[in-house]
Amino acid sequence: MEQFNAFKSLLKKHYEKTIGFHDKYIKDINRFVFKNNVLLILLENEFARNSLNDNSEIIHLAESLYEGIKSVNFVNEQDFFFNLAKLEENSRDTLYQNSGLSKNYTFQNFVISEGNKRAYEAGVRLAETQDNEFSPLFIYGETGLGKTHLLQAIGNEKFRNFPNARVKYVVSSDFAQEVVDAFYQRDKGIEKLKKNYENLDLVLIDDTQIFGRKEKTLEILFNIFNNLVLNKKQIVLVSDKAPDELIDIDARMISRFKSGLLLKIEKHNLSSLCEILTVKLKEKDPNIQITNEARHDAAQISGNDVRALNGIATKLLFFAKTSKQNLINTENLKEILFEEFEKFHKKSFDPYLLIENVCRRFNVPMDSVLSENRKAELVRVRDVCNYLLRQKYNMQFQQIGKIFKRSHSSVLMAVKRVAKMIENDSSLRDVITSLVI
């Protein structure tokens, strides 16, 4: 109100030569709103409205008080509420456009697994409230585990729950560039940058590990971070590394990162990777169908990388569109993803994903197979795992023995048993062949 009263004083001075204009039309104005860089003022008298709206000097008076103002509109009561509703809608649109978020990342299409469940729950809690109970929230984990998806989903859910929230998603390299640009601006560019961030309700920072060796950027971030915390604002940071593993970031900044809730996202299991691939395919084209075997194979060669899964889904979409075939099976999958299969066989793979796949095929618990339980059905599945790891993936007997807590000779005997069995059992041979990707 103080700012608007100052504006009225400027109007009074501007119209001092127009006898009675201020006292009759301006003095008693008390309904106004400044939103989305527009100053909307309720004024019932049509003559006064027209006079003020036609005066090009009015906007210049307002510019001295309202930073970034684009227009001053004097309207009647009916138009006031109509324009107010429109301004609020435009304001929400502008808030989202300036947020840096993508509508593609939501909680609805985020696949929850044991590895990300706690981080997901913390994100949901933060998006549903305006308190800073878990802030700063620091989420870390290896590349390709869906951290960026979760981070942006938090922002999108915040907008869904609080349409007028001020949210900003920024990658650390982009923030560093903002700092550089601010240094070259006149009129206290750095102070404006700080103010812009400190006025936010929720700040989402991606790739925090890249901040290393950017001393000036870290200094600015430190100041912003402190003020956000002091003002009980919400902060979420995402990194490939835990705070203590970050390189070239000083201790006081590390301490700030660790001052809230610290959560790690673990690798996905095979079933979660399969579900993620299903979601990705459905998003691209709900008509594409994929067999369970093909889905498992595609998930296994993804390297536990959600981005790689998205690339696989894109290739499957391209195949479906160009070949007019909507069903993906193991045969055409190996044709479509020939390069991916080649790379998978050449590089080191995760033996536990294979073991999980075998256990699913034989319908036995993976933890039982990895235990020392000697039940016949578990021994058989354990032997099959040993055989595949040795014969198809060329793992050393000692490495296999370490996984199953068995001796070199025990693994060797298991491999020989399975080799002999598949000579006489065609159904087992077919099953083992299908398990090799």
Swiss-Prot record:
InterPro entries in alphabetical order: AAA+_ATPase (IPR003593), Chromosome_initiator_DnaA (IPR001957), Chromosome_initiator_DnaA-like (IPR020591), Chromosome_initiator_DnaA_CS (IPR018312), DnaA_C (IPR013159), DnaA_dom (IPR013317), KH_dom-like_a/b (IPR015946), P-loop_NTPase (IPR027417)
Source organism superkingdom: Bacteria
Region (Domain I, interacts with DnaA modulators): 1-72
Binding site for ATP: 144, 146-148
Similarity annotation: Belongs to the DnaA family.
Signal peptide: none
Principal localisation: cytoplasm
Cellular component aspect of the GO annotation: cytoplasm; plasma membrane
Keywords: ATP-binding, Cytoplasm, DNA replication, DNA-binding, Lipid-binding, Nucleotide-binding
BP GO terms, sorted: DNA replication; DNA replication initiation; regulation of DNA replication
Disulfide linkage: none
Function (record text): Plays an essential role in the initiation and regulation of chromosomal replication. ATP-DnaA binds to the origin of replication (oriC) to initiate formation of the DNA replication initiation complex once per cell cycle. Binds the DnaA box (a 9 base pair repeat at the origin) and separates the double-stranded (ds)DNA. Forms a right-handed helical filament on oriC DNA; dsDNA binds to the exterior of the filament while single-stranded (ss)DNA is stabiized in the filament's interior.
PANTHER family given in the database record: CHROMOSOMAL REPLICATION INITIATOR PROTEIN DNAA
Annotated SMART domains: AAA (SM00382), Bac_DnaA_C (SM00760)
Protein name: Chromosomal replication initiator protein DnaA
Chain residue ranges for the region called Domain IV, binds dsDNA: 321-437
A GO MF term: ATP hydrolysis activity
Description of how the protein assembles with itself and partners: Oligomerizes as a right-handed, spiral filament on DNA at oriC.
This protein's record includes keyword ATP-binding: yes
Database matches in HAMAP family: DnaA_bact
Location of region: Domain III, AAA+ region: 100-320
